[in-house]
Regions:
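Short, small/polar residue-rich loop motifs at catalytic or cofactor-binding pockets
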Residues: 29-30, 48-50
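Cyclic-nucleotide recognition modules
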Residues: 30, 74-132
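A cytosolic small-molecule/anion-sensing beta-strand core signal
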Residues: 38-39, 57-58, 79, 104
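Short phosphate-coordinating micro-motif centered on Lys-Gly-acidic
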Residues: 39-48
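Polybasic "coupling" helices that flank or enter modular domains
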Residues: 121-189
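Phosphate-/nucleic-acid-contacting segments
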Residues: 162-231
Length: 231
């Protein structure tokens, strides 16, 4: 059965904990823009200014991050993404860190930044939810620094991928030259080649021309055990 607008809003991270009356007030005062998309349609582009909140209410999203020096491209499949980079609505860098498009037909709900500031931030629950979203992002970044106490080459590769990922869930596709990856993680090309082949032998990733694919990086990280370093 199709969800009502109240039910859809209550599922969104920013509105969790609101009463039916509070949701009704949001709908009465805040303009909600709905847009339908086809598979392959782009939602926002990397570097584009974040001018509001964009919620994914239907469909599967793909995110693409391109290094500013064109050394690599990371594509993530994000079937459970609910909102696109709400933490970049404020702060010093108010632009999207990557491009987002639909891998299927989809639908978004957008709320302009002016509406967020004027109406939504006046609600204490919404302000707390926004703080939680921002704090969670910061804490994820901090935890990454302590993920592997003693970095082997394989661990450096995993940390590199996670450092540029939105989520630990979903498939990650990396387009990168072996020499570029070696330079980024401060290893030799030979060490990187050996490490990638070991990871493939263990079923953690699949090597392909110009890069590799990891189907489940969360499982890969959780299952990872230290290997003998090839330094």
């Amino acid at each position: 059965m199709e969800l009502t607008m109240f039910e859809r809003l209550l599922q969104l991270p920013l509105f969790q904990g609101l009463t039916t009356r509070e949701i009704a007030e949001v709908m009465a005062h805040v303009r909600l823009d709905f847009v339908n998309y086809h598979s392959g349609d782009e939602i926002v582009m990397q570097g584009e200014r974040c001018q509001g909140l964009i919620y994914i209410i239907q469909g599967e999203v793909v995110a693409e991050f391109r290094d500013t020096d064109n050394r690599f491209c990371l594509t993530e499949h994000l079937p459970h993404l609910k909102v696109i980079e709400p933490y970049n609505l404020f702060g010093m860098y108010q632009t999207y860190s990557r491009s987002y498009s639909f891998a299927s037909s989809g639908r978004t709900l957008s709320i302009d930044k002016a509406m967020v500031l004027r109406y939504l931030m006046a609600n204490d629950i919404i302000k707390i939810n926004m703080m939680n979203i921002t704090c969670n992002k910061y804490q994820q970044t901090q935890r990454l620094l302590c993920l592997f106490p003693d970095d082997t080459v394989q661990q450096k590769i995993l940390k590199f991928i996670l450092a540029h990922s939105i989520s630990r869930k979903g498939t990650k596709e990396i387009q990168i030259k072996m020499t570029a990856l070696a330079h980024i993680i401060h290893e030799t090309r030979l060490n990187v080649s050996i490490a990638l082949n070991q990871l493939q032998e263990l079923g953690f990733l699949t090597l392909q021309r110009g890069g590799f694919v990891i189907k489940n990086i969360q499982q890969t990280t959780d299952s990872f055990t230290p290997f003998t370093s090839h330094k």
